[in-house]
């Protein structure tokens, strides 16, 4: 076994499993939609955010035939009078021609409707007429127009069903009309939601005719054509855009305007709202026209993401999903590959020490890996053949690994395989609990608990090549297999992307063609600048969407019912288990491809790391496809604690490479360029534009300060050593600071503003302190650090049940309202609170002076508390919460827990300088989990306080019982004093511990809690 510098004890690890559930079904193409209703709402600015008024446009064949306003029932007489006067004095912006060929006139008058009449219009156009119902941020506007809601069931479970129609019963009470549909909305993330009409009692026969059919079908429910412009803009651009940003990007003539004051009905405010609807209407036309250029069969309302469009292109080329056309492909290989899946590398290597850098990144990393490894041949193969027992072949391959071997592009196609190894100091990605209760992936020296083959883990061959590059040793291989594509699937079809870029899946590598055609656009004279930019953006989006994510897609099911399923993982045989919220593989999910692609990305970074290290250098940070190499114009030693070099005077240092040396490394990667050199002539490793002055084009000295993974800043220094952050449209093309860990917080100076310059202020202070320069106190440091959360699910809304009691829907905190979230300081929990399950939320309020007095409610218990930023600790009724100053201080000291300091001990908050890899011993057995990326936005913003709450764990009953038996034996061997100490450490009562000793079974959560206490404590 390899000797370790520090053994910090065994860490719990987790590996992914492949759950054998039916993949999600592809969407059918919808018929041509003629009519469109576009609407937008304005609201009160109080905590209820109730509808005041809105406006709409009704279009047929692109011509506006009616424009109108609608208003809430509870307006004051003065507010209603204002709207009535406005409607009388302003004409509608309709097309005076109407549609004469159909005999449809337009209405020149600006219509004014009560909200009930607008709901009827919506029903008539969107349900009976099957027109397009359109808004920007659809869930919010739909929820404003509703008269109530219930929690959704079945396909929309985890969402809300909004009610739009009611009637009065015999006693005069309002009742929901069951003969009219509701609209169900299930939040996916800030850009996407599932939407659809719900079923109604005794629907008309015509409403039961499926799309594209002519006869009614019993049980059919028309779900509607509901388009969120924000979602479609995201699907087309892979960017999260505001209405203003989308209008600018797509060249809308009448874009969004601004208004000084919201919530008060004035003629100016009505103008503002009408302009929003006009902007939305013009944006819809632009987006729909852009979407129509894509030669795909996907209904526009089902284009939820770039991946949706990417999959539709595969379908258009008749590229069927691998598991659909090869249903007999052994799922155990999918399980082995899924357990070998790890996301991109991300870490800080030089911590909290500003160092000069050259910032580099790999061109379209995942697409490039696909081309290098020939993975398109797998996507289009007639058959994928598995060759087992490749241990000797793999060992021989690994013995040849050197940098030059990896730089030989012909070797990459030999790496389509997986192996189970017994780690013994090999440098490998490992998903472990390095700190706290969440899983993180670190690339470290991994050690098995024993030499036994059953203690082995599966890895993709590129990860093993990376380990050999970084350690010089071949791992102990227990099992190995490789994959090979055989032939081509039948029926593949060529197409023209957006009608302009021909792609033939039979003879071309799709991933390669997308990159090459994008590069060739600059030389095309047949395109306008606008169309060239749009085509370039579309090709980039398509390449990103199809090169990785669709092969890794797992869709979490929201049902709270336990589902029995079969899981494939690290073992030759699968196991059966029951879980809540299982994950179904996506339509194109194929774990071998997903794992090979990400491991190929790891290998590129490992090769870059090795080439830098061979020249005596290091890097400040790495992030998936980028690396900030410590480098200066002439190179030399740079002061850095923990560095391997010594400067005059005895200070520890790292070596900065020269710009020339970095350029030499970049040139080496030209050998791995798999593209047509007439289109892409240079290296796949790029020196980023940030390194060059945008005015002169000359290279400039960048500096980097990294705290931990994804928390770093790039900056310049003037002649006096003063730092200057990289700022978009000031001295750079993009901002040079990370928002990770801060982006969910409100602007402390103006909570209604989307301006994030306060984060730049914070980073500048961190940089100045690291340079030993004077720093001005932040003016907002003492304010409560608050985030804005959307009430996106019933579980977020339930804590407000007491606050909402006996109030009308308009007065309630409603679905898709904005609410506030704060963060508990260390030792700040109230005395009776469970720190593991405690999160305070409050009604939305824009006035910071009122934040401390709001009713703050624990999301778990529903109890109400007060908050303070000045108490030392929490009390029975008061929670000590973090101020912006507290958050930023923690941010600046956030440890890089998956790395080690110079001595080999785990990095902590005080660690400064050069980090190294940890030596990690695996705690066996591993935990078997699903994807880590469930509800990432909610975790970031705070509505899901603990990432562990959204992992799906697939317990293996075979291991579970063996492990529990060992725990029970340990309990039986403990003395009374040891049991009492265990009670304190675990929080599990002595009575329960004794019952388990006698043989009573325990819930899996309690088993995990007990195992953790036994692992962390010494009971002497």
Placement of each model-derived feature along the sequence:
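N-terminal accessory regions of nucleic-acid-interacting proteins
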Residues: 1-41
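Two-metal-ion RNase H-like nuclease active-site motif
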Residues: 34-44, 228, 358-360
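Conserved acidic
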Residues: 50-52, 57-103, 109-955
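A short, Lys/Arg-rich alpha-helix, primarily the initiator
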Residues: 956-975, 979
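Short alpha-helical DNA-recognition segment
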Residues: 975-994
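Residue-level detection of the helix-turn-helix DNA-binding "recognition helix"
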Residues: 998-999
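DNA major-groove recognition helix of helix-turn-helix/homeodomain DNA-binding modules
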Residues: 1004-1020
